[in-house]
A protein has these predicted regions:
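Bacterial Sec-dependent N-terminal signal peptides
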Residues: 1-30
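Membrane-proximal, proline-rich intrinsically disordered regions
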Residues: 20-66, 71-72, 94-96, 246-249, ...
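Conserved, well-structured interaction surfaces
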Residues: 41, 45-58, 79-154, 168-182, ...
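Short, surface-exposed recognition loops and adjoining beta-strand edges that mediate ligand/DNA contacts
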Residues: 62-78, 163, 196-212, 225-269
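A structural signal for well-ordered alpha-helical segments within the folded catalytic domains
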Residues: 106, 110, 182, 208, ...
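TPR/Sel1-like alpha-solenoid repeat signature
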Residues: 140, 211-217
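Short coil/turn linking the two alpha-helices of tandem helical-hairpin repeats
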Residues: 151-153, 158, 199, 220-229
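Short, conserved phosphate-binding/catalytic loop or strand-edge motifs used
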Residues: 160-167
Length: 269
């Protein structure tokens, strides 16, 4: 009798534990995660949305003016600690804006890489190929723009395409500025070919946005290279030579012409 009671109790306990385990095992339907987030075209659009705002803040806040218009002497602000050092050519490694801008650009790079790789690895079967290509193009637009700034302002930069892998590889030699800008051009060329002609929402980039930025990047390469398409060795050393690489000047003209003639833009009345 005791043995029967023991067997019944054991079976009852097993059933209770099994039912409890089933009750406690549920799929995550509320918190976003890599495995389940990228399940619709709208989710991909949401994944690239952050690339338009906060990641740029530390650059746009002050450094945009000091390192851009300030250094070009388009503005002056003698009593400004974050503009005057640049207009007066007295900035140092500790000058306001430098570290913030560097961090901001690499935040853009990191988040763009995350978007590209997560979409590639975790997109569900319901996601259309068109939505994936559009998302890749938006992320590469932002990454390319950040790398153009890095190459132009520091003349060196660390190029990488997988943020998760980079975390485990903290010592990486910097690439030459011209190589960084070449990488940026490749990103923008991809964006120009694959972005839509019209924005899906106000403020989103289009193919004409990419062609406009490309025109500016080609002008940079016209001064950094001597003749023909960049091949790793035709790097200019005399920046006062009085001429520019006509290959990239022509590329810049074509990209700008495409925006002017085909884009939905017009001069103000």
């Amino acid at each position: 009798m005791k043995n029967k009671i023991l067997i019944i109790a054991t079976l009852a306990g097993s059933l209770v534990l099994s039912s409890c385990e089933d009750f406690l095992t549920h799929d995550n339907t509320t918190s976003a995660n890599q495995e389940t987030f990228f399940d619709t075209d709208e989710a991909l659009e949401a994944a690239t949305a952050p690339l338009y705002n906060y990641v740029w803040n530390s650059f746009n806040d002050k450094a945009y003016y000091s390192m851009g218009d300030g250094r070009a002497n388009n503005i002056t602000a003698r009593w400004s600690d974050y503009i005057y050092p640049y207009t007066n050519f007295t900035e140092t490694a500790l000058s306001p804006g430098l570290e913030d801008a560097w961090g901001s650009f690499y935040s853009v790079v990191a988040q763009s890489n995350y978007a590209i790789n997560n979409i590639k690895d975790y997109s569900g079967p319901q996601v259309s190929e068109k939505a994936k290509v559009q998302a890749y193009a938006e992320a590469r637009f932002m990454r390319g723009l950040a790398y153009w700034y890095i190459g132009s302002l520091w003349n060196k930069g660390i190029i990488y395409e997988n943020t998760a892998e980079q975390v485990n590889n903290s010592v990486v030699p910097a690439n030459r500025g011209v190589d960084v800008i070449e990488f940026a051009i490749r990103d923008l060329e991809y964006a120009a070919v694959n972005l839509s002609k019209t924005a899906s929402d106000v403020g989103r980039v289009t193919c004409y946005s990419a062609y406009a930025i490309l025109s500016r990047m080609y002008l940079s390469m016209a001064g950094l290279t001597t003749e023909g398409e960049y091949n790793g060795s035709n790097i200019a050393t005399d920046f006062n030579r009085g001429s520019r690489n006509t290959y990239y000047l022509d590329m810049a003209r074509k990209a700008a012409t495409k925006v002017i003639e085909e884009g939905p833009y017009s001069l103000l009345d």
